[in-house]
Amino acid sequence: MDRAKVIIHMYMSIDGKIDGDWDGLPGDKISGDYYDDQLFRLGSANANGSNTIVMYAAKGHPDLSKYDGQKIEYRDWVPSGIKAITWDVSYDRRGRAGWKKNYFPYAGRRNRAIEVVTKQASKGYLAFLQSMEIPYLVCGDQEINFAESLVKLKNYFDIKTMVLGGGALINGAFLRAGLVNQISLVVAPYISGDSKKKGTFETLGKFIDQRF
């Protein structure tokens, strides 16, 4: 399969939590900056699940009613001539991300947005993405076909390596699908101590029989 390689790249506490009271403290600046610096050394695309995307990159609430009645087919849509040095891939099966721009500024770069959706996303949402010049890939009916998405990301955008930065659920989904090539962990100099916070991987209780 000619697909983009996947590297899970996570910033976590010593006890393996991906967020908490330690995040953003002065003492985590060096390790946090190192994480950001390494991200685009590892690959040209930063990818996240929809929970992370709506929390950080696409916080808007677009009015989709203006797109009612749009005759849009459930097929990939990529603007003609689209080019970027770096990309921001949103795994967003239901179409939740409220983009206000068609890029996400992160790690000193303007990373052009790409949406990976399923047929659960409304046609109004797809019309909204087209109005924003945000390309989208339809990969599945109910659940995302991750392998298909990686093939399309390479074919359409020449993304050779996709860097997956969480959250825990999307990391676990890629692990369960057997699509992770490498794992990169940057550790902050703090212990979270909060058992309610998510760890780096949520595999839904399944052992992943793969050595990294």
Q: Residue locations for each model-derived region?
A:
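Enzymes that bind and transform nitrogen-containing heteroaromatic metabolites
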Residues: 1-212
